């Protein structure tokens, strides 16, 4: 399969805003809160990875009395990813906290309008408005980020990460053996998903939480802060690269637990 390097004239993850927006707090070493009334947690992964990115988060949540389940996205279209997320949500009994990492914020924003969902949690995730796509959130004319160097497009229309640059782009602070394994088992995402728009925005009516990855090299940190402010989220910053579920699973689980114990 022949791959072509992604150029700045195409859809990339550049710097959207040149100014910085304040977050509520900067947090490290959060403490997980044991499960209360809301125990069900639905986890939605991002591009280039599959549901296994949540492995250690799931373990921590289970140990604290939660019932986590991870969605496996097909990533051949946003429409099908929304369907896959809804299928998992439909199997849940009782209230749910819906969690999205990176691209996973797109289906979370759409599916989160379901009455079962009591809160939304975003980790360096897309948080679009109604009628927005990922393309709409990103500025293709701004300077690029280092993680762009890893992104390639296959001739059949999928984004991939160059395995040798996978860690640099997503998780240069995560355990190297885990990152190396994920780089050769990555899941590509169809280019067309970046132009598909959400038709609902659950954060308008649901409580939301947002964890900014302050050392992100593939999604602009300023964009994350902007989205968090736009949706009115309770916001923290984690000193980590893009893939917090890999590098800081304990903090990710703890932040989810804060959301779960804050809703009724």
Please give the residue ranges for each predicted region.
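Bacterial N-terminal signal peptides that target proteins for export
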Residues: 2-13
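Flexible "cap/lid" loop of the alpha/beta hydrolase fold
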Residues: 116-117, 121-163, 190-194
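Conserved serine/cysteine hydrolase catalytic core
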Residues: 81, 187-231, 235-249, 254
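Gly/Ala-rich beta-loop-alpha elbow adjacent to hydrolase catalytic centers
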Residues: 99-104, 108
